[in-house]
Design a protein with these regions (language model features):
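Transmembrane alpha-helices of multi-pass small-molecule transport proteins
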Residues: 11, 34-84, 109-115, 133, ...
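Specific transmembrane alpha-helical segments of multi-pass solute transporters/efflux pumps
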Residues: 22, 26-27, 55-105, 140, ...
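Hydrophobic transmembrane alpha-helices of multi-pass small-molecule transport proteins
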Residues: 54, 107, 123-145, 199, ...
């Protein structure tokens, strides 16, 4: 393998690690923040702050002119990935346990593969086997976490998440097909500010802005919000969007399989939650499936 190819492979591995770990911790951060902030206010604040910082960085650098295609890409990412994808996640976090919510997001790789298949790109056999194994691991993990019958609000939240993953997969595919942004950081800021504006409107419709206790937020809440703005939003999103340009969208979407594993391990390590042998076996099956999806394309 040549040096440029080796460097590219290393960057891809690092980017995947950033996405896997960063987004795997988002559920925990949202869980704590929702104790003090309404859902759409939380989403709007997070992405207004992150988008504003990305825009400030862009304005401090030499600027290429905005292309017409930049607006189409920003609308696709801002609406489908941020407003819908993240908005549904934050909203559902009120009604669903963190682990189950992360499990529902594992439908994203399934939608991505189905979309690629419908558009004429049949996945390799090992990728399909990996999807089956990873899906089985998630079902096993979910069966280990199920309790009493879900309420109507929980069913609605779960259905909303599944619909959001379908729209996320469509948005990721659209971004991959469109020309790259003339400036990657400006493109990131445009997507975040568009998404934040829509989340703010959702909050207005939902009545969230009538309950805005930012002046009384605890120090812990501010730290969690800072974590979501800096390492997660300004660290994970650039890595994710770069990966969409470098590898198939269905491969990038494997983060959704790893998220429940990260959430489960965080609960075990930080919250002293029990990790049963069944849950551990489910995690190993999920990681095996993800490995097959990744290496099955080589």
């Amino acid at each position: 393998m040549s040096t440029p190819a080796r460097s590219r492979s290393l960057l891809i591995v690092i980017a995947f690690a950033v996405v896997y770990i960063g987004w795997g911790t988002t559920y925990l951060a949202n869980h704590f923040l929702l104790r003090e902030l309404p859902p759409f206010v939380l989403g709007a604040l997070r992405f207004f702050l992150a988008g504003g910082l990305a825009l400030a960085w862009t304005l401090s650098q030499p600027r290429a002119p905005i292309q017409r295609s930049d607006w189409g890409s920003a609308l696709a990412g801002g609406i489908l990935l941020i407003a819908v994808g993240q908005g549904a996640l934050i909203y559902a976090n009120q009604y669903l346990p963190t682990g189950i919510l992360a499990m529902l997001y594992t439908t994203l790789p399934l939608w991505s593969v189905a979309l690629e298949w419908l558009l004429g790109e049949r996945p390799p056999t090992w990728v399909l086997i990996g999807l089956l194994i990873a899906s089985g691991g998630i079902v096993l993990l979910m069966s280990n976490s199920l309790g009493d019958e879900a309420s109507t609000a929980q069913w609605f939240a779960g259905s909303l998440v599944v619909l959001a993953t379908l729209l996320w997969a469509c948005g990721a595919w659209l971004l991959r097909q469109r020309p790259p942004f003339s400036s990657s950081w400006r493109g990131l800021s445009m997507q975040m500010l568009i998404g934040a504006s829509l989340l703010a409107l959702f909050g207005l419709w939902h009545g969230d802005w009538q309950h805005l206790p930012t002046a009384n937020l605890s120090r812990e809440a501010w730290l969690w919000l800072l974590y979501l703005v800096l390492p997660v939003s300004l660290g994970v999103y650039p890595a994710y969007f770069w990966l969409l340009r470098e590898v198939p969208a269905s491969l990038v979407s494997t983060f959704a399989f790893v998220n429940p594993v990260v959430a489960l391990l965080l609960g075990y390590l930080l919250l002293n939650e029990q990790l049963s042998l069944t849950a551990l076996g489910a995690c190993l099956a999920t990681l095996l499936g993800v490995s097959l999806i990744i290496f099955g394309r080589r």
